[in-house]
Amino acid sequence: PLSIYAKTKLQGEYEALKHVGPVSIIRTAFYGINPFSKKSLLWWIIDNAQNKREMDGWENMYFSPVSANKLVDVIENMFNESLTGIYNVGSVDSCNKFDFVEAVCDGINQPVKINRIITKQNKETLIRPDYSVLSSEKLKGVMTWNTKWCDDLDAYLNNMLPFPEE
């Protein structure tokens, strides 16, 4: 693992696999609005855009985001089909954080200045790797999975939960 964050996630997987009985582990990078908390990337982007605050978008940090709605669909399918094992749940394509921020702002019709930023991390300060794209090939082998990040984001933004109260 490249960071403490990754190391503790892996330790959690090892602990789960020690469980007696069926185990399912999902690796994902999901986004969504929690109506009880403001701590999410999506909420941060929308809040900044609505308040016309400029943001930084990292051009060299790639991921394969999926909405909380799609993740729930996968979990429901895994439960109904009694699927066990370790599965990556990510969009079939990927984007960088700049593209994600820009797509959210476009999707909510809130133009705002987004600075193109290149992160420079060293091993001592590394929180997340620059490339954290997940391959969902194993998932595609057990269920229909063709979720593209931009289509999923558009659908999520069009049916989004309300924002947390102040």
Regions found by a protein language model. Give the residues of each.
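Residue-level signal for the nucleotide or nucleotide-sugar donor/cofactor binding architecture
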Residues: 3, 63-66, 95, 134, ...
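Active-site helix of classical SDR
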Residues: 8
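NAD(P)-dependent short-chain dehydrogenase/reductase
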Residues: 14-63, 70
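Glycine-rich Rossmann NAD(P)(H)-binding loop
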Residues: 57-62, 87-95, 141
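Amphipathic alpha-helical segments that line or abut small-molecule/effector binding pockets
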Residues: 69-77, 154
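Mid/C-terminal beta-alpha module of Rossmann-like enzyme folds, strongest
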Residues: 74, 81-124, 130, 164-166
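A hydrophobic C-terminal alpha-helical subdomain
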Residues: 121-142, 146
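Amphipathic terminal alpha-helices
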Residues: 148-166
